[in-house]
Every structure is written in C-alpha cells, then in structure tokens.
C-alpha cells in the first residue's frame, strides 16, 4: 500500500516547486522509496518528507510500505520501488534473488531484535534457559528477528532443532502472545515495546545480548543504481541529513516519532521512544564510510556482519550458498556523496 507520508512528500514538493518557475517544477525527479511503517530506521523518510528535503535536491519521492522484508524485496522484481530500507536478512536474500545492492546502513538494531517471553514464563526461562528446549517460538522467518532469536538459542547451547518454530507476521505474534497462545516470540522494536507495555511480556535476550550484530540496510535495485547513480546518492544524502537532524533535536524528534508510529498503528510510551534513540546507534556520512571501508582490499566491518548473516541463512536452508558480501555491498554511492561538496554539506547538516 502507499505510505502515509507519500501525500506529505507530494504536497511539500508541490509547494517548493510552486515557488519557482514551471521549469524548476519539472526538474523534480520521481524516486520510488520502499520501507516498513512505524519503525525507527524509517523515521528519517517521514522527517525528510515533512521538511521538504527531497525537493531541495530535486527529488519527488513516492513511498510504498510493506509489513516485513520478504514481501518488500519481492516487490522489487516488478520495479515497484527503486531504493529503500529493510532488515539485513531480507537485504541479503534480496541480493540473491533480486539483485539488490546494500548501499548503506540504517542503524545498529542489535538490541531492537529480540526474544520475548510472556509475563508468566519469562522469569523461569531467564533462570533456566535450557528449559526453552522443546518449546514453541513464534517468529517471522527470514527476518532480523529470526536471526536474533537463533543467535540467542546458540548462546544458550540450543539449536533451532531443539524448539518448534512457527512463522507468522509481527501482528500475529503480538496477538498470539497477548492471548496466551504462545509463550515465546521473536519481535523487533517497536513491537517489543508494545508487548512489554500492553501485555507485560519481558525481553529475555536480544541480538546484542547474544553477540550478534544486527544492522539495518539501505538498499537499491542494481539496475536502477546503474541507470540513476546521482539519484541514489541524493537519496543517501537526504537520509543522512534526517538522522543528523533527529539526533540534534530529540524533543521534536520524539514528537514526530509519536505521530509517525501512530500512523503505522503503533502507540508506545515516550520512555520507549527515547529508548529507541539510546539503544540503536546510527551513522553519519563519516561513520558510514568508516564501517564500509575495505582498506587494502580487505573486508569491511559491514562485510563481516553480513557474512555471518549469510551463514545463518545458508544454515537455515534459505539458499544453497551465501553470497559474498563484496558482491552486493557497496560504498560507491556514499563515496559519491562524500566527493560532491553540495551533497556532502547537505548530508552533514543538522538544521
């Protein structure tokens, strides 16, 4: 479905274009952006649309939203979107099946992907993790939540075969746990906070607790990136500026997050919204280039994260052979931003 911020972006673009000549209006180039609603890493898309930053770089965004990463990446086959954000697990799957590129990192969501237990069972599982053996865990397959859960199981000396895994969407997991039909669930924020606040569930292990790096990915269709590299660079510059602004104006950022989450059907406390900021590091332009740097032909930090994710997916039977990180992760477009004085200055603005 079309994202709720599409109308905002269109309206802002119209106003900005309308202030100049008709020729200026014609210079706005459509770019199709995909994301998942009411998620921390998607907030910059909303903020940038509200602030009119896409139009400042000559872009007119058209947004589409998806409930999870797998249907999102599948939609790329029909070219329904050009660029976007998603989890690192679907980004890797998208590289194999749909020739998608990972062009940057949205955030470190290692803490935000976790295994939760219902209020009545959590303490028992925490005291004796081995008791999870034989239990049923509901989670969204081929997701960052799935990766975090299996990393937690490994931390406790358990394997996927030691539990029964049932795959379902995040809304279904919340419903199942809230109604007492499931005791253990793999969720990602802000759904984790919804379960804690509305149903008294407890987070018993996160990807971070298990030592698993769980990044979010900025992605692009390879064919689009080849045809429109400058638009991809502009997309990145807008996204990076939005994070700069969000981190520098947290009170206003929290207010905008509240509205954005509510549009996606999520209502959480201000304390939980603040926790999103404190537990999920983001990267500015310099930070992105640092973690994606392949100095002397070696692997980057991001390569290492995705190599482990690929191994997890291969072990799951998602594909027979994991893709080499260097084949689908590229800093080419971030370097374009860095090399362009205008884009670099834009990306680094916090106002």
Predicted features along the sequence, with ranges:
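Short linear loop/turn motifs
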Residues: 62, 271-283, 324-338
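C-terminal segment of classical bacterial N-terminal signal peptides
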Residues: 8, 13-23
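Pocket-lining segment of extracytoplasmic ligand-binding domains
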Residues: 121, 172-270
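Positively charged n-region of N-terminal signal peptides that target proteins for export
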Residues: 1-4
């Amino acid at each position: 479905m079309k994202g709720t911020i599409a109308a905002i972006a269109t309206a802002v673009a119209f106003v900005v274009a309308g202030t100049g000549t008709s020729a200026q209006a014609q210079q706005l180039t459509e770019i199709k952006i995909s994301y998942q609603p009411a998620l921390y890493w998607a907030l910059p898309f909303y903020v940038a649309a509200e602030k009119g930053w896409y139009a400042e770089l000559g872009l007119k965004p058209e947004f589409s939203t998806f409930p999870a990463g797998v249907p999102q990446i599948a939609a790329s086959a029909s070219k329904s979107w050009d660029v976007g954000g998603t989890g690192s697990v679907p980004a890797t799957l998208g590289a194999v099946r749909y020739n998608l590129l990972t062009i940057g990192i949205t955030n470190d969501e290692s803490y935000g992907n976790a295994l939760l237990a219902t209020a009545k069972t959590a303490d028992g599982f925490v005291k004796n993790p081995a008791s999870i053996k034989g239990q049923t865990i509901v989670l969204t397959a081929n997701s960052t939540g799935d990766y975090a859960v299996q990393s937690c199981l490994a931390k406790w000396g358990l394997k996927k075969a030691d539990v029964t895994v049932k795959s379902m969407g995040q809304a279904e997991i919340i419903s199942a746990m809230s109604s007492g039909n499931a005791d253990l669930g793999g969720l990602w924020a802000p759904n984790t906070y919804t379960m804690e606040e509305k149903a008294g569930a407890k987070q018993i292990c996160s990807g971070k607790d298990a030592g698993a790096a769980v990044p979010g990915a900025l992605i692009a269709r390879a064919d689009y990136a080849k045809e429109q590299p400058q638009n991809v660079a502009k997309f990145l510059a807008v996204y990076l500026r939005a994070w700069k602004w969000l981190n520098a104006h947290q009170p206003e950022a929290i207010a905008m997050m509240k509205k954005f989450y509510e549009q996606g059907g999520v209502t959480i406390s201000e304390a939980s919204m603040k926790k999103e900021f404190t537990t999920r590091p983001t990267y500015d332009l310099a930070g992105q280039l640092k973690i994606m740097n392949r100095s002397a032909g070696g692997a980057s930090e991001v390569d290492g994260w995705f190599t482990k994710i690929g191994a997890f997916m291969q072990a799951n039977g998602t594909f027979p052979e994991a893709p080499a990180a260097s084949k689908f992760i590229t800093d080419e477009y971030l370097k374009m931003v860095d090399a362009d004085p205008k884009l670099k200055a834009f990306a680094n603005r916090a106002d």
